[in-house]
Amino acid sequence: MRRAKKVPKTSAKADERRESLFDKYKDPSEDSVGPEGVERLCRDLQVDPADRKVLLMAWKMGAQQMGFFSRSEFEQGLQVLNANDVHTLKTSLEQVAIKVDHDPDVFQSFYQFAFKFCLTEPRQKIIDIETCIQMLSIVMTNQAHLQPFIDFLQHQTEYKFINNDQWMGFYRFSVEVAPDCSDYDEAQAWPLLLDNYVEYRQKHP
């Protein structure tokens, strides 16, 4: 069950400003912000659509579909972010980025969201390797295992897809295992994917 977002108290004027901001970017024929609206919002925020802050925004807004924000997601998300215009949204996203990088529990929540956000089809439980690499590159920053793991994924041929256990396993691995894998313990029952990664690292130190 998804945890309910803590929505701060707000004024009628602030509600109107959030509604106005949603209306500015929403699709003319749908009551949602679609890809074109997201692109315009990104331009106004002065960020690339592939920037980490856009994924952070989707996370804080509880977005269910990549590239889209429903009215409730957008307006309640702005409320959660304590923002009611582009300027305050930009500032809030910068603060969220700092918190994610300094609070392990917050980062883990963001990291877990990133995988689920990539599941675009009903009953989908896996993501392809290319999507995994792209998402890892956005979500993780300055992590010692990130680039070596990406190199491994690009060179290996056994795995075409990644599941949630493997995705979360890499998070735990990145936190618990030394950059050179010297303290890696097979007895901890890591996903086989990570056993193979360690073997790759031993061959490519």
Regions found by a protein language model. Give the residues of each.
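EF-hand Ca2+-binding helix-loop-helix modules
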Residues: 1-30, 35-38, 51-57, 65-123
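Amphipathic regulatory helices of Ca2+-sensor modules
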Residues: 33-46, 69-83, 126-141, 164-177
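Generic structural motif recognizing short loop/turn segments at the entrances and edges of beta-strands
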Residues: 43, 51-55, 158
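Short helix/strand-bridging catalytic loops that position acidic/His residues to coordinate divalent metals
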Residues: 59-61, 153
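A short structural micro-motif
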Residues: 61-62, 177
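Extended, charged alpha-helical interaction scaffolds
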Residues: 94-161
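Intrinsically disordered, low-complexity, Lys/Arg-biased terminal tails
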Residues: 134, 142-205
